[in-house]
Every structure is written in structure tokens, then in C-alpha cells.
Amino acid sequence: MKFKINNSIILVTYIFVTSSLFSQNDSLKKEIIANVIDSIDAHNQLEFEMFRSERNENNKFIEGKFYAKMENKPLKIYIKNEKPRQGAEILYIDGENDNKILLNPNTFPYISLSINSKNSILLAGGHHYVEQAGFSQMSKTFKYYLEKYQDDFFEMIYFEGIFNWNNKKCYRLRIEYEDYKQISYYAKNSETLYQICERELINIAKIKELNPGLEISKKLQDKQKINLTNHYSKTSVLYIDLENYFPIYQLIYDKYGLYEKYIYTKLVLNRPIKNEEFNRDYKDYNF
């Protein structure tokens, strides 16, 4: 079913931008957002390479790159790292292996481990957990803001034109959350930071920074005060491929500047992925 809205580093080259009146036309923005949601939700299986650059609590950017193949429902994902820990592999299938991740660290003693998906070793200095890989979080976020703000959401979105990025024509959208700020939140008994971030669709890495010493999966006490942000970011800049409406280049800013950068390349949407490719004994894997 189509998602409907009311009323119906790589060289980036500017192609054109329409008049300011057209560029901020709500109909165009609604069409782009609806197509992004539809496209992400329509593709259950996908492959890609992703480069990441993420700012840590010491104000340093940690880089990484990996190849992934995944199925969204039920969640199945295989990852092979290029940077850091080149050759390390991850396999996760929702509901199997006691919901643990199978990890081949590709280092001594060269044995595969089953570990909790929230184990910090899996982050490798990054911001996000395995369950958040891919594009589903973007679709969820757009749906969340459309439900919360309805047409007012489009007042936060600025269409900045069509650009060539990595030899692909892309819409560029800038989303401004002008009221972005830190807020206090009082936990309900036994909920965790991870559950709160998933429910509110806010940035887990940022919330960890704001609550040093609190484990992401530890149950909180009733009315325990924690620090959150009211949005995922202050500003998000998205390059959306005109061919498939996937946000293949993402720049995420907090109040201090660039916080996250994600680059997706070699995106494959239509190759069926066999069940055997989510098995530890698959011929190309080294678990």
C-alpha cells in the first residue's frame, strides 16, 4: 500500500535549483517524503556498502566502512567490515541464537562468539547498533514526524535543488529542527535508555553522551531523571537518489556542528537473497 500524505570523501555537483517559490513548494516536498517512505518500505531485501564518520565524546571523528546484506522483516543481517577490524563478520537473525549476534572478530584466537547485540565491542567507536542498520529508521522517523506534526512537518523541510552526487542525480533536502534542545525525562519503572531512544526516535549515541555511566540496556528506576534531546538532530541534510528515492548520503548535525555522516554505495535493491546467505555455514563466510 502506498504511503499517502494529505494533498497528495565524493564530489557533489550542483545541477539546478528552481525559484525560491517552487523550491519550497509543499506539494513537491510531500511527494519526495512519500516516495522515500514507499521505496524504503517496499524493499525488504537489500545490499550496500556504507562509509560512516561519527563524532565521539572527545570531539574526534571515528570512521568505518562495511558491506551488508539484509532482510528487514524478519530482521536478518550479515556484515563484513573493511574498516576498522578488516575482515570481521557479523550475523544476526531476529529470534535465533538467543537473539545474540554471531561475531567473527578475525583476530586471535580466531573463534566466533555469540554476544549481546548491545555489546559495545560491536560499535567499534560508532554510534549505532546492528538492529538499526539500513534505512528503516529513516522511514520510521518520517512517519513519526508526519503523525506528530502533520503538515507542519513540511515547514521544517527545505528543498535545495537537484545535485549530482557520486554520479547520481539526487534531491537535496535540509530538515531544520529549530527547537532542538536538551530536556529532562523521568523514566518509567524498568524501561531502558535503548527503549526510550527507539520509542522517541532520538540519537542513541547522543543520549549516551548526555548520561555518562548509564548502560544503554540497564533497567532504569521509576522516575529516575535522565537527559534526552527532543529531536534526533538539529539539522539533517539528505541526498535522495532520484532513481529509487533512497537517502544515500546523510549529514547529521547537532548544536556544535557535524555529528554523523553516512555514505551508501553499491546499493542493490532487486537481487533476491537466499536463506542460506543468512547461515553461518554459507560458503563465503568465515564463522
PLM feature spans:
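The alpha-helix within a helix-turn-helix
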Residues: 197
